[in-house]
């Protein structure tokens, strides 16, 4: 088990780290980066309503909805070192996520994190800034299914400027 306060984990955005065993977040587009060995990784989350996206080794994002005590983020990977990017997609009104760490394969471990970028940007706004309805058409009650904070203009501009 990798605890939330492991020094090899990198957190971005607003995280409440007052409890070393359970970090919390409530805003969209917060994320975690980690480099790990092994063939799989699971997240220990308590989060009934939110949606997340995961990218392994810079690949395409996969949509994730937390399930139970452990949510599979990736499995059947080639043995070796991998890069994880784990991003919350839904806005703050959906509630708070409790993150309790990651589960890795037996014998697997976290590796040293990548160097932090020197530029930082901050965007303040409303649901447009948060990526509301930017991932599909609103049809009834699918609001959260068509929201992706990581594809809002703030994160996109940050990536374009290498911030």
Where are these regions (language model features)?
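N-terminal secretory targeting modules
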Residues: 1-124, 128-149
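Phosphate-binding active sites in nucleotide-utilizing proteins
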Residues: 141, 146, 156, 161-162
């Amino acid at each position: 088990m990798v605890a939330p306060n492991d020094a090899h984990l990198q957190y971005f955005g607003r995280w409440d780290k007052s409890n070393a065993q359970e970090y919390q977040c409530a805003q969209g587009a917060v994320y975690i980066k980690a480099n790990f060995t092994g063939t799989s990784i699971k997240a220990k989350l308590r989060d009934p309503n939110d949606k997340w996206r995961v990218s392994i080794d810079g690949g395409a994002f996969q949509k994730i909805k937390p399930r139970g005590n452990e949510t599979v983020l990736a499995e059947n990977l080639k043995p070796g070192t991998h890069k994880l990017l784990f991003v919350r997609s839904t806005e703050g009104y959906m509630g708070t996520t409790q993150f309790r760490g990651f589960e890795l394969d037996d014998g697997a471990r976290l590796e040293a994190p990548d160097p932090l970028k020197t530029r930082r940007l901050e965007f303040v706004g409303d649901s447009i800034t948060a990526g509301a309805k930017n991932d599909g058409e609103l049809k009834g009650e699918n609001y959260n299914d068509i929201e992706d904070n990581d594809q809002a203009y703030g994160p996109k501009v940050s990536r374009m400027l290498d911030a």
